[in-house]
Amino acid sequence: MKLTIGEHAGFCFGVRRAVLKAFECAEKQLPCVTLGPLIHNPQEVERLRRAGIRSVETLDEVKPGETVMIRSHGVTPDVYRQCEARGIPVIDATCPHVAHIHQLVRQYSEHGDAVVIVGEADHPEVVGIAGWARGRVFILPDAQAAEQAELPQKALVVAQTTIRRDRFDSVLQVLRRRVPDLTERITICAATSQRQQEAEKLSGEADVMVVVGGRNSSNTQKLLETCRLRCERSVLVETPEDVPPDLAEADDRVALTAGASTPLWLLEQVRARIEENAKTR
């Protein structure tokens, strides 16, 4: 069995930055909570919890003396206002790429542009981005939605940072035809594009493709979609225990990639389990 691990697998810059900030708080014994799970990976969230960093869903759950950490997905301006009004200290771990989108949205919407976000309406990053708009917001998950929407005459279009480029491009084609005055900003994260391109290449050359990551992670699910287009035997593995004993045959080419919220220690554990299973077959 030949095993290959993608060079771009695992934590992206924004997630790595947020996790480091959280563990720094734990080391300093600073009472700190994250507003929502810091990352979409249950194993890493549990590791943070054991270090003393718990997750809350609302500001009402924050105890006196605790600091709130904003996760890499970012939040709406209203969250910052509420924290200030309640006297809650904030550590802002919003990914700089996401923060840049916030500023674009605020700037263009203040000048009268509607805002089109290509992404998933219920994703926390998209919810946060939409909150920075001062006017009309359209959230379009795909080209079909773009065809059906009552679009404005003038708009800024941005992308959820983890959206697949082909999906963004398909929506963009519709917008170019239907929105006369369109400002385009391709805000897909470079790391996301690199990871997806690498996953395409690896899955096209592999007999078995393993995507390591949380089942609730949007970018992990998108990686799995990408891999399944080129490799029928593509599987999602959240923990080493999820690795099927009969995953691969002795002469199979196996490739691994991981979502942006997947820590390298977990990727290594999955790799070790695959190799261990191969030895016992």
List each language-model region with its residue ranges.
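The feature marks the mature, well-folded catalytic cores of soluble enzymes
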Residues: 1-281
